[in-house]
Amino acid sequence: MTKLVSKIFKRLISQSQYMSSSTTSNLPAASQTSNLESQLLSSAPPPAKKKRGSALLWYLVGFTTYGLGETYKFLQTQVEHLDSRKQCLEMKPMKLNTTKDLDGLGFRRVVCKGIFDEQRSIYVGPKPRSMSKSSEIGFYVITPLLPIPNEPNSMKSPILVNRGWVPSDWKENSLESLGTGGLVAAAKESRKANKLLSSQQSLLSKFWYKLNNPMIVEDQVSRAMHVEVVGVVRKSETPGIYTLVNYPSSLAWFYLDVPKLALAMGFGEDTMYIESTYTDMDESRTYPVPRDVENLTRSKDIPLDYHLYTVLWHWSSLTCFIKASSILMRRLTKSDPIGVEPILIPISILVFICTKIYSLRNLFCKIDTIGVGCVTKLDTGKVK
């Protein structure tokens, strides 16, 4: 009997030990499953807010790059200016005897007859001149053209003429011929002219000033030759950031300031300024070198990189729009967009951009807007 009871107790003890061991072995598996569930939850993508925000960001970048691409095509607005300049410059030069109604001339060439007063010439610069292999530093020589007495085809009032580009030796020789006394006298005359013209408020002073101009011309007729100048009416230059300030008292002129130049020569501030031009350059003529007519239309070609920049920015914009659209389509359809239509859209837009750029290939150039005189938009039918 005792043996039977002992056997029963042993079986109960062994069963309890087995149950405890099985429960302890199941604990790591439960912990592993909980870890896997937490990893899956953490790796699951947050829904729509992130995708919607990324799509808006791509759209913003797309609009920005498209705007940058359009800035390189802004010069197409200058087509009318280019056409009007070409038409005006191709016309036959007209005789200009008066300084009235200059705004109606545009870029039409004019012919002015008079006498050069080379003693009052002023050199503006330095101005570089591009050669075939290098560049040379020189100056623009500005000389007053005085009226011819008793000549009906002559100018009625003095004008300033930019005769063209000359080497630096011309200015050095001019200063040497003047000498120290000449420089002081020229500075005094400049200051005297400024004081005289600034005080021209009354009718008597204006009459006295106009009365003195013909006397100067008559004294110089015997030692001057009659000349005809063909050029374009221009205005003052806009100085750059690094351009030095003009010092009329020291005869130092770094940019074209027409009113100040006229005052320094003893004329009024409203004196007309003409830039001499040529169509066929005479090779036997050395200096001054007038400005080529073609340079009045286009002064400097823009590099080919601008075309590449336009294609680059528009292509970047197109890529951003496609990326943003694909994100929205995935959000709405919950599947990747496939098929032929998404491929045809970027190809068609790319073809449109390329054809647009090719049509504007002749307009990628800098328009000469510095020193432009009068009106550039001109109805040639109204020009007489």
Curated annotation (Swiss-Prot):
Keyword Mitochondrion among record annotations: yes
Cysteine pairs bridged by disulfides in the record: none
Pfam families: SURF1
Subcellular location(s) per record: Mitochondrion inner membrane
UniProt-listed GO biological process terms: seedling development
Spans through the membrane: 55-75, 302-322, 338-358
Keyword Transferase found: no
Record-linked InterPro entries: Surf1/Shy1, Surf1/Surf4
GO cellular component terms, semicolon-separated: mitochondrial inner membrane; mitochondrion
Keyword terms, alphabetized: Membrane, Mitochondrion, Mitochondrion inner membrane, Transmembrane, Transmembrane helix
Main location: mitochondrion
Membrane topology according to the record: Multi-pass membrane protein
Similarity section: Belongs to the SURF1 (TC 3.D.4.8) family.
Function: May be involved in the biogenesis of the COX complex.
Name of the protein: Surfeit locus protein 1-like
Organism field: Arabidopsis thaliana
Native organism taxonomy: Eukaryota, Viridiplantae, Streptophyta, Embryophyta, Tracheophyta
